[in-house]
């Protein structure tokens, strides 16, 4: 895109800051439901609320013409990818420190770079391989204390990053198929029933931590709030990207990690330690190295809430 005026860029970056901060607020709300309701059920209810809200928005903006489903198999792939990412991320933030889960999920652009070579046939630059090595060194540093304390649950955010990487890859293949709001609606329409099925199956076979019992009104309200913060956050990020460009907005993704660390400390008494900070710094460094190697850069996504 052509260079935007400085005042417009400043406004766009402030709006992006608000968008990424809202995503972290939603993540903190999800974490506050740990022990109240299983993460798969929370993710299913959140996406069903999201689908209803987006349906209303599509109807108001595009009318009946907005209810289309281009390239159904590709939409199924997008929905399955975001369903996996959301459920794994919610499981992760409920089990481990919010900042650690957020940092590990930020490896999704690194995984996307790998998938772009395997799936889209794009050349992966040498700098991207260096970024991959640095970021995954950071993941190992962050995972080690969490793995010792939690076991396999510590790998949930990595599953979320894998799902987001597939979503970004599918999004690039489906670019231009329909307006952005319509594409968000089709995404939610596929993810919502998939998450309902997953939550039901895990409730039957997943053990005590996955059993869906009676939910309180607070849980329903919190799930609705997460749907609102996520949809609003992604809309603000998209607006900022269209007005300032992905190259300027993408590095601001890491504001989300700073906000997550602050909320984790203030809300859940999760004071960051030196080891986690070192690992998170490596992940951010790898992400920034990847961003510098990309021309054009991938649009920012944030966490999959």
Regions found by a protein language model. Name each.
Residues 105, 121-141, 147, 151-156, ...:
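Loop-to-transmembrane alpha-helix entry segments
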Residues 41-44, 48, 91-121, 246-263:
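Specific alpha-helical transmembrane segments that line the substrate/conduction pathway
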Residues 31, 39-40, 54, 149-208, ...:
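Transmembrane alpha-helical segments that form core, pore/gating elements
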Residues 2, 254-305:
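C-terminal-most transmembrane helix of multi-pass membrane proteins
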Residues 12, 36-84, 163-167, 186-205, ...:
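Transmembrane alpha-helices of multi-pass small-molecule transport proteins
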Residues 102-107, 174-190, 231-266:
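Helix-helix packing/entry segments at the starts of transmembrane helices
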Residues 11-19, 58, 64-88, 152-160, ...:
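Loop-to-transmembrane-helix transition segments
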Residues 2-3, 51-70, 137-149, 192-218, ...:
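Membrane-interface helix-cap regions at the ends of transmembrane helices
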């Amino acid at each position: 895109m052509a260079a935007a005026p400085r005042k417009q860029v400043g406004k766009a970056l402030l709006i992006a800051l608000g968008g990424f901060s809202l995503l972290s607020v939603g993540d903190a709300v999800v974490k506050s439901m740990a022990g109240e309701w299983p993460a798969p059920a929370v993710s299913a209810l959140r996406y069903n609320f999201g689908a209803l809200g987006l349906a209303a928005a599509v109807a108001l903006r595009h009318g009946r013409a907005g209810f289309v489903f281009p390239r159904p198999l590709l939409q199924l792939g997008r929905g399955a990818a975001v369903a996996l990412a959301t459920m794994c991320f919610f499981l992760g933030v409920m089990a481990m420190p919010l900042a650690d889960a957020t940092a590990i999920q930020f490896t999704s652009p690194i995984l996307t770079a790998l998938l772009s070579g395997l799936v889209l046939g794009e050349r992966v630059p040498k700098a991207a391989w260096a970024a991959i090595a640095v970021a995954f060194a950071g993941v190992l540093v962050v995972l080690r204390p969490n793995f010792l304390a939690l076991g396999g649950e510590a790998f949930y955010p990595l599953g979320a990053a894998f799902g987001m990487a597939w979503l970004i890859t599918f999004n690039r293949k489906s670019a231009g198929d329909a307006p952005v709001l319509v594409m968000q609606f089709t995404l939610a329409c596929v993810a919502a029933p998939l998450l309902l099925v997953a939550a039901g199956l895990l409730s039957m076979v997943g053990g005590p931590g996955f059993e869906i019992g009676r939910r309180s009104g607070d849980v329903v309200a919190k799930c609705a709030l997460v749907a609102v913060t996520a949809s609003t956050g992604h809309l603000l990020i998209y607006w900022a990207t269209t007005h300032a460009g992905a190259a300027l907005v993408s590095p601001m993704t890491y504001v989300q990690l700073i906000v997550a660390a602050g909320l984790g400390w203030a809300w859940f008494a999760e004071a960051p330690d030196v080891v986690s900070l070192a690992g998170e710094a490596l992940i951010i460094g790898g992400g920034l190295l990847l961003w510098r190697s990309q021309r054009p850069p991938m649009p920012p996504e944030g966490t999959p809430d």
